[in-house]
């Protein structure tokens, strides 16, 4: 049998990993064996944190809504319950955005919710 060398394939695979490892510290950006471990771990972190980001942002929106609602003598849970009773269907992301950037609009929503407590 003839000898098969995977020069081009191997070189391209190494280049791909080293390109992903660009900016890493120490040998992790230049040594293939170290770089492949670091890139795999980085991809695991990225996968995990894409899911955690959704969790974190929901918590942030709830904190912002709660802080804005407490200025109007309400608590977050009461406010959300009152919104549901009032038939106002706005998600937390939009409510938090209104609370931060459009206080007049948020106040009108709070007043409508207060009427249904």
Curated annotation (Swiss-Prot):
GO terms for cellular component: ribonucleoprotein complex; ribosome. GO terms for biological process: ribosomal large subunit assembly; translation. GO terms for molecular function: rRNA binding; structural constituent of ribosome. CDD domains: Ribosomal_L20. It comes from the Bacteria. The keyword Ribosomal protein applies. Keywords: Ribonucleoprotein, Ribosomal protein, RNA-binding, rRNA-binding. InterPro entries: Ribosomal_bL20, RIBOSOMAL_L20_CS, Ribosomal_protein_bL20_C. Binds directly to 23S ribosomal RNA and is necessary for the in vitro assembly process of the 50S ribosomal subunit. It is not involved in the protein synthesizing functions of that subunit. Belongs to the bacterial ribosomal protein bL20 family. This is Large ribosomal subunit protein bL20. It comes from Rickettsia massiliae (strain Mtu5). The lineage of its organism: Bacteria, Pseudomonadati, Pseudomonadota, Alphaproteobacteria, Rickettsiales.
